[in-house]
């Protein structure tokens, strides 16, 4: 029986946040030497990060790694700040999606955006640097939210340019962050996740506005 205050429709969301926090918490404690062993983070990245080279001629650490990494990378983060920003965003966007869709639809968008973000990163990212973080999936959630808003505005003959303005703002923000981070921002995953989430929003069921 769920305790008061826990929404049963948010169980997958709770689980995602918990898993990401536990993993990064353990890695951060390992970095400080409290648990684990030297270079524990590097080893976890070796097995769980998204490595574009594994889609070419690199030898995987285990047979399923070239496929599993399309999902596992989204559970890893580069540090506590990276984790905090992504989990706060996941909590906010996740609830917004679950306000309009079922838990199953949320899973479709989130996992689909993880796959789509990784695929676009593999195609467009220069070099063979690895990728970690849930931001591809987060942009997928945002893409779904904006797609539903566009659909609602279209049905109500509202201002559809509002959605276009938000998309352009997001593109500009990614450009600024990419420059500020000296090209280390995985904008390709953001783009792929967003497009996947947008498309998924047109394919899955959602609650009408009046029933939210």
Please place each PLM-identified region on the residue numbering.
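A detector for small-residue-rich transmembrane helices and their helix-helix packing motifs
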Residues: 1-212
